């Protein structure tokens, strides 16, 4: 591996892994279940790196041996052919392992393991945009089912002809943010709306925001910045009209963010839920600002033009979903039915490649 800093990093990871293995075997650790669990989790997060590094070291030894055989087999054409083939295979294997190791050593996004709030807002397109927001809600709910995640509706504003003007889901499970963070942005649909009598294709949009859940320590909100009113749940467009004012309408004065919560059973629960959504929204704004800085830095380095917020177009006539970041088409119906794993894995892979290129540039400069 040409990059000496990577070898140093791998040796350091291996030392940490061995130390954690030693601590797990210590009877004192076993007597403290919390400590044991914490160490086991840390060790588990390094296991793939260490195993891949071991495989790489063995392949390096085998390559030295195969090259030696190749060098010494001048008088035996058959043996020379076998040795040349083995050298070739080992070089390919080592190349793959080195790329894999670089990916495994990329810094992890600290939010990757978090649960999320997923917000869908109808954009341009009137009633059809609200119906489209409802279709996206169904798509994400189905994808969450395939992942074994739990989905709960936490806030909704219904569209007049169906769907939603705005809807927020809470999604809980393993590494939710690590996958769904790539869904944030504008989703555009091109189709003949159910509301269209003339059979003309319309273009509508909905915006998806992915907000990692945050606790009160991470985002502090000054109570003076909050304006809160209560109302009866239900009413226009809703069921379960209550005589008690359980619904909460919360306004964050500095940002103008407004949240209306009706889904919980009591006013207190709705207030807590509204504050939870507000924290997630404020954190997402902060994250977006940080990401925009990184992205603009990346653009200035690689010289690409500004990217549109529009991440995907769903074209019903041609039965395809085009992901504009990947420049790739996918079959429309499976995607709408929640079969998003291929798309998301492609986005993860592209993100890793961009970060690897960035790493190579910065280490070359250093």
Curated annotation (Swiss-Prot):
SMART domains, A to Z: PCRF
Keywords on record: Cytoplasm, Methylation, Protein biosynthesis
PTM summary: Methylated by PrmC. Methylation increases the termination efficiency of RF1.
Residue numbers bearing the N5-methylglutamine modification: 239
InterPro entries: PCRF, Pep_chain_release_fac_I, Pep_chain_release_fac_I_sf, Prokaryotic/Mito_RF, RF-1
GO cellular component labels: cytoplasm
Main localization of the protein described in the UniProt heading: cytoplasm
Subcellular location(s) of the protein: Cytoplasm
Domain of life per record: Bacteria
Family stated for the protein in its record: Belongs to the prokaryotic/mitochondrial release factor family.
Function: Peptide chain release factor 1 directs the termination of translation in response to the peptide chain termination codons UAG and UAA.
Record protein name field: Peptide chain release factor 1
Organism of this sequence: Trichormus variabilis (strain ATCC 29413 / PCC 7937)
